[in-house]
Design a protein with these regions (language model features):
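Extracellular/periplasmic carbohydrate-active domains that bind, remodel
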Residues: 1-342
């Protein structure tokens, strides 16, 4: 695959098409002004490796943490049956990563873009992600659409018995934890996310503006850390945690977000008993140095939501200019878990 990419750059077509079955054992770097088309292609992570499947060209480099190292106009497009498959779980988790010779947990993202201006990821199925499937940090002017997920639903009980189908009261049994679908982190803005389906072990779409080790590693000098100007439309997923989650803490702003159309499909999924929330904004738990203020979480619109988990909505912390409309509950779900402080 790397040779196809290199050849398309040399001949200046800057578009490569791959088909068939591929085993990936190290990250494929996508250059600027480039389109990779996966046409009836099944890309599977090799057993036992600790690696992303795709990263942008300057990801993880010194210049990649500067405005001069911004990669631009990268497209990953599926045609027909295009699949990114995490394969067999490699055991790397949030509890054991970065210890005893293990790499950081973000090596388990199927796709990790950092400092990219102009991108499109669409018409792809993601299966068996080993952590978050699609992760974006300091990425702007992008489109993520027509993505279908199916996380690993394996659980192992206290006696070592393996079973499938996740249950809220047996979270400790879950093999692959925090297997989100799409994550936008700090510095992301002007992005449309739409038409998201399938099953995720944790959040299906998460806009999480924190300032942890991940964000500090890939922060871009001189650029704003705000997570803003994002629209999320038509999310129809079964999420063991939350269909759409928003969270910011520790001086990072989250604002000007529109969520329009979230339908909790948990009651129709064989993978979970039910989820927690359809939409969740904020958290009572502290992830950073402090909770956000209302001047850091603002201008958020949530409309046309139907939830059937524990609650339809969860609101926590401080926020202002929050607009809610068209919120419905099904299957006896409670409407609102309200832990707001303002």
């Amino acid at each position: 695959m790397r040779s196809k990419i290199e050849e398309s750059v040399r001949n200046e077509s800057r578009t490569a098409i791959v088909s068939g079955n591929w085993e990936i054992d190290e990250a494929i770097r996508l250059p600027s002004n480039f389109t990779l088309i996966l046409e009836d292609a099944h890309l599977r992570m090799a057993d036992g490796v600790y690696s992303n499947m795709f990263v942008n060209e300057h990801h993880g480099t010194d210049i990649g943490n500067t405005a001069n190292g911004t990669d631009r106009n990268i497209n990953l497009i599926g045609r027909g049956n295009a699949m990114l498959d995490g394969g067999n779980y490699n055991g790397l988790s949030e509890k054991n990563h970065s210890r005893d010779g293990l790499p950081p947990i973000w090596k388990n993202n199927l796709l990790l873009f950092t400092n990219v201006d102009g991108f499109k990821v669409s018409d792809i199925s993601c299966r068996n992600q080993r952590w978050w499937a699609l992760n974006f940090i300091y990425c702007v002017n992008g489109y993520i659409g027509n993505i279908d997920f199916c996380s690993n639903d394996t659980a192992i009980d206290e006696n070592g018995n393996v079973y499938h189908g996740l249950k809220q009261k047996k979270y400790a049994d879950v093999l692959v934890k925090n297997a989100d679908g799409i994550d936008l982190r700090q510095g992301c803005h002007d992005i449309l996310i739409e038409n998201i389906t399938g099953f995720t072990e944790d959040d299906s779409v998460a806009l999480t503006a924190l300032n942890g080790k991940l964000e500090q590693t890939f922060a871009v000098k001189g650029l704003s850390s705000d997570l803003c100007n994002v629209e999320i439309r038509n999310v129809r997923t079964a999420a063991f945690c939350t269909n759409v989650r928003l969270l910011n803490q520790g001086d990072v702003k989250l604002h000007d977000i529109v969520i329009d159309g979230v339908y909790d499909m948990g009651d129709e999924s064989p993978h979970i008993d039910k989820g927690l929330f359809a939409v969740r904004i904020g958290d009572t738990r502290l992830y950073g140095t402090r909770h956000a203020t209302e001047d850091e979480t603002y201008n958020i619109t949530v409309k046309n939501v139907c939830g059937g988990g524990n609650y339809v909505l969860s609101l926590a912390g401080s926020m202002k200019n929050l607009v809610l409309s068209g919120i419905e509950a099904k299957n006896g779900a409670k409407m609102l878990k309200d832990d707001r402080t303002v």
